[in-house]
Design a protein with these regions (language model features):
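Glycine-rich, basic loop-to-helix element that forms the pyrophosphate-binding segment
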Residues: 63-79
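Conserved donor NDP-sugar-binding/catalytic core segment of glycosyltransferases
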Residues: 99-129
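Short, well-formed alpha-helical segments that are part of the catalytic scaffolds
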Residues: 15-29
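Acidic donor-binding segment of Leloir-type glycosyltransferases
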Residues: 28-61
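Short beta-strand-to-loop acidic/aromatic patch adjacent to the donor-nucleotide binding site
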Residues: 84-95
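Conserved nucleotide-sugar donor-binding catalytic segment
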Residues: 10-11, 138-215
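Catalytic core of nucleotide-sugar-dependent glycosyltransferases
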Residues: 202-205, 211-234
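Hydrophobic targeting segments
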Residues: 4-10, 24-27, 36-40
Length: 234
């Protein structure tokens, strides 16, 4: 049941229980409390047992569709249909700085889209801090031209005003849902800003390495030119 005007959207899937606990712990510690957690459950068993540990969170659980892209589509459109004002994305195998929702909403006062910095970590701990700040300064405006051949917008480090978004339809086999979504929004003249005082802690492990490059045994986000297999927004 909807209780707030801000939705935090994620998809859960079979993974280590600790990943999901880390995710929900970070949401329960947010400095801003007035948000609903929308969860598309793609075959994670016994989620109820974990949910009941977080009674302070308003968790709305949804069924899954047949592909990851369609799960994203379903979750986004649900939030539109429920008339949420703001939508914050986060992957359920990541976790977030305590101020992420607060600072994202603050930045959305004057922007349509907010993208925050990421720190990369694995089982050994954090190995790259504020990764995007290597190339971007805080409060940098991000243009359509900037993401023509690269992507900084993930579905774990972005937030949007939902009134800029129509009902979405993704091809069921679409891989780069994030790039496709945000490239289309920027082409339609939505404005976006990068902030680095809110952090997504982006977990790197063997099942979460699509689109990453390996350097000295560590995975890094892919800043280089997108290949022709990506779905273009013409």
């Amino acid at each position: 049941m909807k209780l707030n005007n801000t939705a935090f959207l994620t998809t859960i899937f079979p993974m280590e229980e600790q990943f999901l606990i880390d995710f929900l712990d970070s949401l329960s510690k947010q400095t801003y409390k007035n948000f609903d957690v929308i969860v598309v459950n793609d075959s994670y068993k016994d989620f109820d047992k974990i949910k009941e540990q977080y009674c302070e969170l308003n968790v709305v659980e949804l069924p899954c569709l047949k592909t990851p892209a369609k799960n994203r589509e379903f979750g986004i459109n649900f939030c539109k249909d429920e008339k949420y004002e703001f939508l914050i994305f986060g992957d359920s195998d990541d976790y977030f700085s305590d101020n992420r929702i607060e600072l994202s909403l603050s930045a959305l006062n004057n922007n349509d889209i907010v993208v925050n910095d990421v720190s990369l970590f694995d089982d050994s701990g954090i190995y790259e801090t504020m990764y995007m700040s290597n190339r971007l300064q805080d409060d940098t405006k991000i243009s359509f031209e900037y993401i023509q051949n690269k992507n900084i917008f993930g579905l774990s480090n972005t937030a949007i005003k939902l009134d800029i978004l129509e009902e979405v339809v993704f091809d069921e086999d679409l891989v780069a849902v994030d790039w496709y979504l945000y490239k289309g929004l920027l082409k339609n003249r939505s404005n976006a800003i990068f902030i680095n005082k809110a952090i997504t802690y982006y977990r790197q492990y063997k099942d979460n390495t699509v689109g990453l490059q390996v350097t000295d045994g560590k995975y890094y986000l892919w800043w280089e030119q997108k290949n022709g297999e990506m779905n273009e927004v013409n």
